[in-house]
């Protein structure tokens, strides 16, 4: 059994989603958004760090999966996103979590089937895959999709490792 916290970083809204993986079975544990309403960036980063740290303390995940930085059209936006990612990663590393990074297009392709999926499609598939009664908020759905992607690739790695080390495998 593995508990994964997925993080969709943002300087104004950081989504998080927590799922438990037991073999191929995924269980939804929680999700939400850390919203920073202040204007100065250092305070926003402090709030993101504190929020992610609190979530980790509450749910005790085994690892963190986070979205990789993509190059935004606006360099200032890319820098702010990188800073938000950085404090989220530090929150995980400070609590001894291994951190795994996934590109947004890979997450969309894994969860929806196409790397060009929109937010509504991601929300719909996350709701379906986790058997939720309602769609999560967009940023929380993205974070859950990142965690689901980690489960998918983690399961693939486990199967590959079993084939390589199992002397009974043909």
UniProtKB/Swiss-Prot annotation:
EC code(s) of this entry: 3.1.21.10
Subcellular location: Cytoplasm
Enzymatic reactions: Endonucleolytic cleavage at a junction such as a reciprocal single-stranded crossover between two homologous DNA duplexes (Holliday junction)
GO cellular component, one term: cytoplasm
Pfam families (UniProt xref): RuvC (PF02075)
Originating organism: Pectobacterium atrosepticum (strain SCRI 1043 / ATCC BAA-672)
GO BP field: DNA recombination; DNA repair
UniProt protein name: Crossover junction endodeoxyribonuclease RuvC
Keyword annotations from UniProtKB, A to Z: Cytoplasm, DNA damage, DNA recombination, DNA repair, DNA-binding, Endonuclease, Hydrolase, Magnesium, Metal-binding, Nuclease
Binding site for Mg(2+) 2: 67
